[in-house]
Amino acid sequence: MPKLSKRLASLVTKIEDRAYQPLEAIQLVKENATAKFDETMEAHVRLGIDPKYTDQQLRTTVALPQGTGQTVRIAVITRGEKVAEAKAAGAELSGDEDLVEAISKGEMNFDLLIATPDMMPKVAKLGRVLGPRGLMPNPKAGTVTTDLASAIQEFKAGKLEFRADRTGIVHVRFGKASFTAEALLENLKTLQETIDRNKPSGAKGRYWKSLYVTSTMGPSVEVDIALLQDIEQEG
């Protein structure tokens, strides 16, 4: 087992081995986010699903009401007038065959790729490059669309895609340590509701196994899932 750094080991001693009330868990993570940069807040959710079965897979999007605190670089593969439309809407990169060619050579200076349906046959050929990085556009994720302006604005504002990995764990960033605890809780609650709303049809038994929140350099804190589900959001 790898040794913890002295800093992390000292922080871990402040955390009890129990599930915390949601706001308390977030406050504890914030207190332990002592790195010299604004650490990213992350949620790690273990679900009772086996993604090797298609009816137990989870892949969707969540629009975090308080945003992610991160700048998202968006590339758009389209053609004709929509190339300029994507640029005008805020995409860092937009193009047709030229962008497909650049990506095929490993040039990927972006965090999210959006494509119009007519370009998907060409984008599909990039599966070997995009697939392992989780960047392949997908209609379920809202990244295959003709409404480029809306999609770009939504992802810039805090919408993000997530999926359960092969072990049934979901990893989602839900803000920055500099956010207020209340803002982070609002984002976490929205994530919980999204995961519940998109429960795979084949999920059996206990759906939520565990939920931990952490920061980039800090220790993890377990969250009481039932208490999080009981919170009612305004609006």
Swiss-Prot record:
Pfam families: Ribosomal_L1. It comes from Synechococcus sp. (strain CC9311). The keyword Nucleotide-binding does not apply. NCBIfam families: rplA_bact. Binds directly to 23S rRNA. The L1 stalk is quite mobile in the ribosome, and is involved in E site tRNA release. Part of the 50S ribosomal subunit. This is Large ribosomal subunit protein uL1. The keyword Cytoplasm does not apply. InterPro entries: Ribosom_uL1_bac-type, Ribosomal_uL1, Ribosomal_uL1-like, Ribosomal_uL1/biogenesis, Ribosomal_uL1_3-a/b-sand, Ribosomal_uL1_CS. GO terms for biological process: regulation of translation; translation. Keywords: Repressor, Ribonucleoprotein, Ribosomal protein, RNA-binding, rRNA-binding, Translation regulation, tRNA-binding. One of its GO terms (molecular function) is tRNA binding. Gene3D superfamilies: 3.30.190.20, 3.40.50.790. Belongs to the universal ribosomal protein uL1 family. GO terms for cellular component: large ribosomal subunit.
